[in-house]
Amino acid sequence: MMQPTPAPSSAPGSPQRTQAEPEMETPSYPQPPQNVGTAPFSVLVKLFEKLATERKQERRRKLLDAWFRHWRREKGFDLYPVLRLLLPQKDRDRAVYGLKEKNLAKTYIKLIPLGMRDPDAIRLLNWKKPTERDKSSGDFPQVLCEVVSKRSSVIEGTLTIDELNEILDDIAKNMGKSDVQSKILRRIYNNSTADEQRWIIRIILKDMNISVKETTVFAVFHPDAQDLYNTCSDLKKVAWELWDPSRRLNAKDKEIQIFHAFAPMLCKRPTRKIEETVKAMGGSKFIIEEKLDGERMQLHKRGNEYFYCSRKGKDYTYLYGKHIGAGSLTPFIDSAFDSRIDDIILDGEMLVWDPVSERNLPFGTLKTAALDRSKKENNPRPCFKVFDLLYLNGMSLLDKTVKFRKNNLRHCIKPIPGRIEFVEEYQGETANDIRKRMEQVMENRGEGLVIKHPKAKYILNGRNTDWIKVKPEYMDNMGETVDVLVVAGNYGSGKRGGGVSTLICAVMDDRRPDSDDEPKYSSFVRIGTGLSFADYVWVRSKPWKVWDPKNPPEFLQTAKKGQEDKGDVYLEPEDSFILKVKAAEITPSDQYHMGFTMRFPRALAIRDDLSIADCMTATEVFESLKSERKRKMEDDAGITTKKRKTTVKKVALLPEYSGPNLKKVAVKTDIFNGMKFVVFSDPKSRTGEADKKELMKTIHANGGTCSQIVNKNSEAIVIYGGSITPYDLKLVIDKGIHDVIKPSWITDSVTLGEPAPFKKKYFFHATEERKYADEYNEDDGEEEGAVPSADEQERDVKSGTVEPGSETEDEDEEQAPEIKEEQDGELHEWLKVDDRKSPALPAHDEEDSVTEDDSDNADVADEEEPDLDDWFQVKGETEDEGAGALATASRHRETTPDVDGDVKMGESEEAMDYDPDVIFKHLCFYLDSPANAQRHGMATRPKYEAAITKSFEEVEKLIKDNGGKIVDLDEPKLTHVVLDKRDDSRRVELMKRTSKPRRRHLVLSDYIEACIDEGTLLDEEEFAP
């Protein structure tokens, strides 16, 4: 058995070993199946175009499945040549081409050829520059296609898929050799059409824009493809290991392997309140780790060999060293490993440690430090911070708990300060434990915290509530920070013209039933500030589609009135991205489907590290509102100062939360005397609300009473006549207290003149207690043609007899129309979709395989469904008037304490948005000048006092010229504290003094100039002192 190499007795710079150096093993692949030929690249282009324009997700899956099936039938079972072109970003064999837009533009100008003053040459070189006339600006492949189409004489392309792969391999092999690459690209130019070249360039740039996620491609290719890719990050291995769709992997095949990059577990995005994070831990003690500002790294070691790779599978062994005689890290950490270790895999964060200042340096300095071969003791150096042990001596530890893995980790490694260390961790039990650690992190300019459940398993590529990150902005009441999905956009004008300049964002509507085919999104907010010019170039390169008011996107729910959430263009969810948005507060609005929007919203960052699955949900919006309302009530209860006398306006509820006026409905019988009912409308019915009101009138006319809410301890009978289970009804059913009866019971009771027996046929959902009642079991079952109950729907879905989301055959046919356009015979066969059967896909959505919660603590960590009864509370059981969410929000807005209260941001109560032309309007700044510091009893440094004073005079002018206000430290409307980097000694003191009632932004004075230069408000975190 190979033993680890002993620690070197001499310095790392001494002569290296003379024995043969171990070579990193090349991946082993199974023998690929043999194809009988290839296919024209043109048929793959047709698939790309179909996928890019098809609006229905299920239809895209069927198109992909039909294409794959035809390839297997006609060409063979080796789909690797196709997968490389569908998922170029996952192709490790062609990791880098060394060709970006600028190089491609110059190459094409030469090979077309174009004169340097030719308008099209200028257009290629300035493809990013937006203009009113050029709507394709920002999308280089499209610009190139338009330029080539004017000059290319190729009517029909002759390249095959195999030939294109050979060409791309040649380009990758000749990276850095522009002349050779230019000759190779000429083959593409001479043998493919302009449209085909557009897609080839997209493949080279690894930015396909085909509205299909990798998870969809993997799920259609093979049910186990995603799981296997998570363990190896190797597209070729997935293609050749799983070429047979009928062959399934066993559990061992899905385990991680030494020297194979895997997709690591990720943190779930921050919850709205720290208390929610604690609740997600299920009452258990939890582990608190500091979130580090480095690069996620996995370290593999077997004997003398080392392997380092990033979260996305990039090999960094060349930097850190594959043995003790190479690299900037391995020579210094080899002695840290216990001699009993044969092989091991660690998960951690690679940082830069500066031994002079004794602190970690910013992430941007990592590569410089890693490349430093000087080995000088005082130079910054890589330091690997380990937080997990995943593999040990041939055994995978993924199914072991965090606590088990951490305990064993400390027996495997002896830390070497500044080289390899453990992440600092603490035990927590309450929200205050987290706040205490967060205060320390903020004072030390840290990133945040990670909270881990001690019983959590390690889920490859998973993101669940076992690991939750907590960031400072989610605990300090600095306003609302959300992650929303960009769904539409409006074109700008003037200096913001030339493309999309305002983004319309939405949240995922999780109130809808789980059985819906595709997720729906509810419009929530529009953003017009916060993004830089470079951000807008990227945003405008997205595959925007024209918004048709008569046929709006099906996935997006918008307000019935108003134009605030209607765009000029829109993005399919698969092509879109998550935007981190910060605002002063969430406020009522009838201009968005949510019924709420954000006040003073601005973009903080494009979250390219998040997927659309990380989008905020409607329930989280309501929970945030409830939390904020509770906070305000607690603040109000603690205020002893006199409040201004105010009149609370009577606010009408939204229609869906209100009932009919029953005062004028006469009571005719006492059939339902003493009985209370809550009637739910059918969201799928156009007359749902009207039917609900008529049913309530019938109940009232026959002696019953109606309520708008289901109280926890109420004996109310719930009435519902729909075919699906709306989210609010699901919350009621999940409590297991209330039966859900069909409206037919009401009508039959009225016909009988007395309450009808509670037979099974009348139930949409029956409680466990009800199912044992004699009356319930008198009936044999549902009548012919009746709507299945919620329980039966759930059984059918689980057993596979009904596909989740399906309703009727007619609707299925509507949702998957035939391909009507004419195609030649051969091409038609490639895209022929059999609408009678779905692709052979897993029963769950493709995202489930990477996020399924199979942890030991699943039974305790599941968060209880939020109780939203408060949002539907009305004053009288049979009256229209009440106090719902809108009323509550309005009351808090109108009742304002004189002092120490919750002060609204903005120059007026009515102001809602920033002014893009006067960027600091509505903001208030305190300048930490020497004079102001002394006036507030804080010490100053005299060395730069004069220069700092002069600098702040210039900053003050810039702020005022751009609409901002200069205020004192105790101004309630204070938003920003500005410091000078030459003297930030008062940072912690200013942080403490301005933390109530909510924290303010502390920024360096550079922030002011940077915002003015970009013409927008930037993220304050980038300028924190």
Swiss-Prot record:
Subcellular location: Nucleus
Record Pfam families: BRCT, BRCT_2, DNA_ligase_A_C, DNA_ligase_A_M, DNA_ligase_A_N
UniProt KW keywords: ATP-binding, DNA damage, DNA recombination, DNA repair, Ligase, Magnesium, Metal-binding, Nucleotide-binding, Nucleus, Repeat
Domain of life: Eukaryota
CDD domains, per the entry: Adenylation_DNA_ligase_IV, BRCT_BRC1_like_rpt1, BRCT_DNA_ligase_IV_rpt1, OBF_DNA_ligase_IV
Gene3D superfamilies reported for this sequence: BRCT domain (3.40.50.10190), DNA ligase, ATP-dependent, N-terminal domain (1.10.3260.10), DNA ligase/mRNA capping enzyme (3.30.470.30), Nucleic acid-binding proteins (2.40.50.140)
Positions annotated as active site in the UniProt record: K291
EC number(s) from the headed UniProt entry: 6.5.1.1
GO BP annotations listed: DNA biosynthetic process; DNA recombination; double-strand break repair via classical nonhomologous end joining; nucleotide-excision repair, DNA gap filling
Basic and acidic residues composition bias: residue spans: 817-838, 891-904
PANTHER family: DNA LIGASE 4
Role played: DNA ligase involved in DNA non-homologous end joining (NHEJ); required for double-strand break (DSB) repair.
Full protein name: DNA ligase 4
